[in-house]
């Protein structure tokens, strides 16, 4: 009788994958599980509207290294060898069911800009044969033989859990080292992931969900990795596609990724080499050759290596822009879907009109790089955080700094506005950082104290604001023609007139208003990496995988809705004219 030999071990180096060895034999691999704790009365957040109580602490399991990775024993802290880029735990949240209440303080659809690439017929979406049925990726990730994916673990009762779940509950997607988890935060077993993907070596650094295409049967997720590869993932069908495979378009880690607002197919990825790339999830990749010559001087605020108006749109990328030689750490789309705020490791904040492919303004930090950025719900203000331990508020209509926010003792990793606590006069935002603290801030232009030294230069600054506002309101009819400038137009310092107009000098501290936090709380023992505000809660995640949720005080959220019940949504777009700027200046 012929007997087949046993299959070879799945892991070629079991000792490296196992926790250790006993008597020379490898210890069997034990899959670690998520753990949830519900502290009683622990870590409350005391704010004016009430107390935020900690609901639970979900600790994600850190996966062991892949067997192909040699274990690092006694690493040298002084070694100069570059280490692979990593990211703390970050969340992407989505609510499939209808929301009870939307934030009243939001941008009206009537002021939204046209879709990105709307004027290029080469980007027109082809007709869908199946009507409203969404296209899904082609490859089954569970049965994948790709060396990029190590394995996929799905919950044994995932189908039943999806059918029985509360439609108003939140889905969460979280990265931790080489693992990517799909969680149902509305479930009683929220610590049990619906699916967990283990990649071979790559770490997912950023991910995002397409709010336009989400439904009970379809969710589009994109995630960018430390290897530069991008995964388009549809969790319900467990299908996936690999984009920028082996760095064919851009061979650099993806530091941040977002779906382009209003688009079903396009998403934008920031790479560590200073490039912003727009991809189409349904296009094939091709080796990228710049359509415009690459300038190595680094003095241009934006080099368009491929324009969204290009007729060559058969393959990715759709557009590719070079901002700097430094790493892009994060970017954020404005609520009016026209502008883009980008922060870089070189300490600059760059505000773009990404529809016109031009940079409007460049601001600088006091020192060190900028790490995070976000827009206010009405698009009037931009908030950044960075390596100078400061949170900074910038006025977009006035093109200037408004205030520095002091309170952190280490780098600021994430800033976010709370749309349920914002109105026409007061803004609420939060920040977290490597000091393990969560800070909340209330900001109103009228409450800021202008230093006396600042008042002396009001006239000069007003003229600068007017000049910059007029410049920002101009749109070039032919971006390609205006982008080409002769050497005769350049000034003695190497920058042309356009560069000088958008580069703002650093405002001295003596002339900058300071804003203290309304709450500062140390919420853990490891750095905090992410912050999010929900209708009924505040959520954070940390470097070691702690996802904490605080319930809002009922009286606070109810008072907010009652105060706004008779008001209408904002109809004025960001930077819509001098009226916005004049009102802001009058409040100061």
Curated annotation (Swiss-Prot):
InterPro entries: WD40/YVTN_repeat-like_dom_sf, WD40_repeat_dom_sf, WD40_rpt, WD_repeat_creC_regulators
Domain of life: Eukaryota
Any one annotated GO CC term: nucleus
WD repeats: 249-289, 323-364, 365-404, 407-451, 523-560
UniProt signal peptide: none
Keyword Hydrolase annotated: no
Region (Disordered): 452-499, 569-588
GO process annotations (BP): carbon catabolite repression of transcription
Polar residues composition bias: residue spans: 455-471
UniProtKB keywords: Repeat, Transcription, Transcription regulation, Ubl conjugation pathway, WD repeat
Keyword Amino-acid biosynthesis: no
Biological function: Component of the regulatory network controlling carbon source utilization through ubiquitination and deubiquitination involving creA, creB, creC, creD and acrB. Required to prevent the proteolysis of the CreB deubiquitinating enzyme in the absence of carbon catabolite repression. CreB deubiquitinating enzyme stabilized in a complex with the CreC leads to the expression of genes such as those in the proline and quinate pathways.
Similarity annotation: Belongs to the WD repeat creC family.
Subunit field text: Interacts with creB.
Protein name: Probable catabolite repression protein creC
Organism, as annotated: Aspergillus terreus (strain NIH 2624 / FGSC A1156)
């Amino acid at each position: 009788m012929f007997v087949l030999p046993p299959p070879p071990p799945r892991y070629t180096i079991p000792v490296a994958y196992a926790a250790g060895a006993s008597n020379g034999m490898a210890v069997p691999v034990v899959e670690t599980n998520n753990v949830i704790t519900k502290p009683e009365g622990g870590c409350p957040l005391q704010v004016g509207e009430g107390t935020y109580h900690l609901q639970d602490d979900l600790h994600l399991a850190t996966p062991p290294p892949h067997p192909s990775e040699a274990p690092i024993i006694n690493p040298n802290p002084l070694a100069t060898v570059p280490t692979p880029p990593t990211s703390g735990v970050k969340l992407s949240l989505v609510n499939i069911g209808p929301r009870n209440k939307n934030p009243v303080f939001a941008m009206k659809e009537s002021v939204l800009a046209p879709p990105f690439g709307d004027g290029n017929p080469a980007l027109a979406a082809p007709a869908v044969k199946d009507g409203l049925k969404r296209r899904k990726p082609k490859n089954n990730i569970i049965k994948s033989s790709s060396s990029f994916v190590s394995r996929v673990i799905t919950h044994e009762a995932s189908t039943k859990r999806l059918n029985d779940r509360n439609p108003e509950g939140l889905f969460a997607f979280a990265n931790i080292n080489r693992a990517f988890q799909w969680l149902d935060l509305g479930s009683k077993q929220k610590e049990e992931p619906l699916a967990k993907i283990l990649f071979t070596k790559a770490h997912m650094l950023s991910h995002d969900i397409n709010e336009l295409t989400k439904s009970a049967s379809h969710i589009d997720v994109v995630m960018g990795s430390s290897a530069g590869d991008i995964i388009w993932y549809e969790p319900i069908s467990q299908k996936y596609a690999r984009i920028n495979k082996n760095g064919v378009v851009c061979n650099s880690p993806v530091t941040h990724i977002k779906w382009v607002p209003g688009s079903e197919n396009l998403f934008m990825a920031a790479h560590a080499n200073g490039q912003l790339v727009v991809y189409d999830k349904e296009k094939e990749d091709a080796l990228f050759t710049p359509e415009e010559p690459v300038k190595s001087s680094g003095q241009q605020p934006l080099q368009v290596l491929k324009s969204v108006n290009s007729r060559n749109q058969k393959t990715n990328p759709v557009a590719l822009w070079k901002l700097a030689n430094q790493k892009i750490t994060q970017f954020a789309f404005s609520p009016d879907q026209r502008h883009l705020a980008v922060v870089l490791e070189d300490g600059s904040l760059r505000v773009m009109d990404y529809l016109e492919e031009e940079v409007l303004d460049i601001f600088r930090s006091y020192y060190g790089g900028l790490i995070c950025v976000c827009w206010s719900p009405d698009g009037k203000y931009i908030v950044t955080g960075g390596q100078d331990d400061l949170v900074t508020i910038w006025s977009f209509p006035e093109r200037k700094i408004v205030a520095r926010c002091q309170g952190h003792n280490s780098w600021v990793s994430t800033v976010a506005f709370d749309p349920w606590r914002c109105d026409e006069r007061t803004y609420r935002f939060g920040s977290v950082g490597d000091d393990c603290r969560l800070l909340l801030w209330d900001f109103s232009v009228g409450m800021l104290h202008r230093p006396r030294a600042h008042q002396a230069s009001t006239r000069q600054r007003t003229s600068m604001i007017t000049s910059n506002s007029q410049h920002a309101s101009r749109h070039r009819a032919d971006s390609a023609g205006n982008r080409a400038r002769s050497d005769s137009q350049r000034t003695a310092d190497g920058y042309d007139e356009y560069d000088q107009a958008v580069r703002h000098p650093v405002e001295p501290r003596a002339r900058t208003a300071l804003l203290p936090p309304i709450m500062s709380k140390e919420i853990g023992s490891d750095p905090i990496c992410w912050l999010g505000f929900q209708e009924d809660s505040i959520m954070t995640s940390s470097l070691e995988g702690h996802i904490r949720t605080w319930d809002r005080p009922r009286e606070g959220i109810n008072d907010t809705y009652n105060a706004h019940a008779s008001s209408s949504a904002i109809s004025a777009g960001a930077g819509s004219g001098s009226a916005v700027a004049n009102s802001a200046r009058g409040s100061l």
